[in-house]
From Swiss-Prot:
The record marks D99 as: Stabilizes the basic form of H active site to accept a proton. The record marks N13 as: Discriminates between blocked and unblocked aminoacyl-tRNA. The active site is at H23 (proton acceptor). It comes from Bifidobacterium animalis subsp. lactis (strain AD011). This is Peptidyl-tRNA hydrolase. TRNA binds at Y18, Y72, N74, N120. Pfam families: Pept_tRNA_hydro. PROSITE patterns: PEPT_TRNA_HYDROL_1 (PS01195), PEPT_TRNA_HYDROL_2 (PS01196).
Length: 199
């Protein structure tokens, strides 16, 4: 029987050296949600930090799991699939929050399905779930330099930290990302897209 719980996954890499990198936007946003709703994390089978709690908005409540995979980015799907199977969570109750180089810093786009856009964490989840049909909160981090070695540039960019101006804006951006995930849960993806994609 399917669970009524939602699973909100923030993508990133575990460990102090990755904590403030662009690739950890998902972790940062899930931490914002955990802070808002007083949700505490515990270890799930060595695969993820997992928190369980309730969110309330406009008289509605929703039961949620917040997840930060500990598998490193490229194997994120293992953690998501394990939690999905263990708790019987439907695909349409999964929201994945991740960094996106195709969007400028501060922009948010919501989608379900479609291409992974070169994001290895999303590729892993698509592969493990055998489907791309879950909601995604794409959080812009801007694009790496296109000159020289594009692959090296990309790795250095996503594993690099935000500049001083962006760090000042980061709390507001993370709050927007958390708002977007909440809107998907309480109002549905279409309304959430109308609200956030046009910004």
């Amino acid at each position: 029987m399917a669970s009524e719980f939602w699973l909100i996954v923030g993508l990133g890499n575990p460990g102090a050296k990755y904590r403030n990198t662009r690739h950890n936007m998902g972790f940062m946003t899930v931490n914002e949600l955990a802070k808002r709703w007083s949700i505490h994390f515990a270890n799930h089978k060595g695969l993820a930090d997992l928190g369980k709690g309730t969110m309330s908005l406009n008289g509605q409540t929703a039961k949620v799991f917040l997840c930060k995979p500990l598998t490193y980015m490229n194997d994120s799907g293992q953690a998501v699939q394990s939690i999905r199977e263990y708790y019987h969570i439907n695909l349409d109750h999964i929201v994945v929050i991740h960094d996106d180089m195709d969007l400028e810093f501060g922009r948010i786009k919501l989608k379900s399905g479609g291409s992974a856009g070169g994001h290895n964490g999303i590729k892993s989840i698509d592969r493990c779930l055998h489907s791309p049909d879950y909601a995604r909160v794409r959080m812009g981090v801007g694009h790496a330099s296109r000159s020289g070695d594009a692959h090296d540039n990309t790795i250095n960019w996503v594993l690099g930290e935000f500049n001083a101006a962006q760090r000042k804006q980061l709390p507001e951006f993370l709050a927007d990302g958390a708002d977007a995930a909440e809107t998907i849960v309480f109002e549905g993806l279409t309304k959430a897209q109308d609200k956030f994609n046009a910004r």
